[in-house]
């Protein structure tokens, strides 16, 4: 379940209607600071007395004055690296710099810079108790509009993860903390664990209460959960808590395209879980009350590492989209949370209605869906091949009409057949049902047959022709759109 539903409908690109991160007069009262014309999330939290100790984003600045690097990419062709900065102080990422640097090859995000004064940068995670060393995200896999600018998010697929085990200023022991991230309900799975927040410093499961991270996904740790998710939950170690002692029927999940996921914990007695549409409206408090009473959570035993896309022991089977996130010192007020949510709304996160780029295989992140030799000959095979940097043979357009287009034609199911093993080919676009594809839970499904695009036998050898097959959730049926 690792593919966002980019072309299920035409998405309107939302332009920011002006920053709305102004704090209420009540929030500012007694803060001892003057209100800037524009206050971004970490300005808001600082004014409320709970400053950011970590601020990570590949899309935008999270302080009005920040004008440094957001993330670093590494080029596959020669190993060179470059930082991607903001366009201006308090602004959005200079995605054009990435496009230019990575032209003709692929790039990986190898570091996400902390914008806070603590400098808690995230790098690719090492091996842990539950998983081998992680890999970096494909830097071009998650294009998104933010503030009217085309930028990139972090496309977390199984095996991708980031970590900092030697942080500064992050809550330890029973100190209070808040954390939020902006993610998407269109790219989730039930693997453990799409987290952002506080974790163990030795990459091991050290027991109850040693984590304090916000989780988003469809993993129901304490059945029975309300619906099928995805849910915002608190990963407090040895459990994803929807509220209380784990099971919370009031937590109905957050299913909007873009989601603000928030968890805060006073470290000694209470925690809260909130979620909301990152594009409009406020936050819903799914839970606010006692910490779990099973033992080990009252008080908490936080260790102060920071993780993204993985569990505390480096469980790295998760999938998710990450656009921005912060961690605070102290337990933020609801008023501060609400003002941060208003600022997030103003960004206008939106997926482009039609995007072009590689379709990356879920069973091997170095392989892409390829139109053999970029040929426009009907019947040309659609195959697995090494990702080669958006050449004509791999530069697919995910169109709003449900087709996957390349080289002037469409991805086609041979003869409009529905049998397992039917070959996938290039054919002139003709509006046929055998050229329709829908992204569902990480799979590319042909609605007419109800079957999935499949890499036969998990064979990622160059030249393996793709087929139609009964959907089974296997990684050989997972595809990551541009």
Language-model-detected regions and their locations in the chain:
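Extracellular glycan-associated modules
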Residues: 35, 39-52, 76, 107, ...
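GGW-centered surface loops in extracellular recognition modules
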Residues: 37-131, 346-357, 361, 368
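Sequence contexts marking disulfide-bonded cysteines in secreted/extracellular proteins
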Residues: 41-43, 51-54, 99-108, 193, ...
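A motif-centric signal for short, conserved binding hotspots located
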Residues: 139
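Lectin-like carbohydrate-binding module/patch detector with strong preference for beta-trefoil
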Residues: 353-482
